[in-house]
Amino acid sequence: ILPQVHCYRADDMLSFLQLADEHGFAVRSFHHAVESYKIRDVLAEREVSVSMWADWWGFKLEAFDAIPENLALIHQAGGRAIVHSDSEIGIQRLNQEASKGWHAGRRVGIAIGEDEALRWITANPAWALGIEDETGRIAPGLRADLVV
């Protein structure tokens, strides 16, 4: 079982990690996690991926402390950043969402290669779901839909 946890705030993520330690399991990914940048080193060290929006914030109290550099800061700390969306329209344009996060990082001096940002919507989500041996990369034996 690869636990996926829905939460927004850093204190909630830390509390859940403590709960996981007490009960002997590991969290695979936090979803939404708009304050993950505050605990990025902890998340990277524990190999917890973070599935988040590029720029949704402020729509409710838990989402007020989001920043557009969140994806880039998680990546810079060595964590697994993942772009996601709750929107049926946004999910069709995750490449554009990844680009927003990539540009936000570059604006504050975080050098991220385009190939690395592409992992935010390919290899990292596959890892979070535990299907990285089947898809998420272009490699012999893996499944992929490619448009050239």
Spans of model-derived segments:
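His/Asp/Glu-enriched, well-ordered alpha-helical/loop segment
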Residues: 2, 22, 41-44, 48-148
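A general structural motif
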Residues: 5-9, 31-35, 60-67
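Polyanionic/metal-chelating signatures
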Residues: 1-27
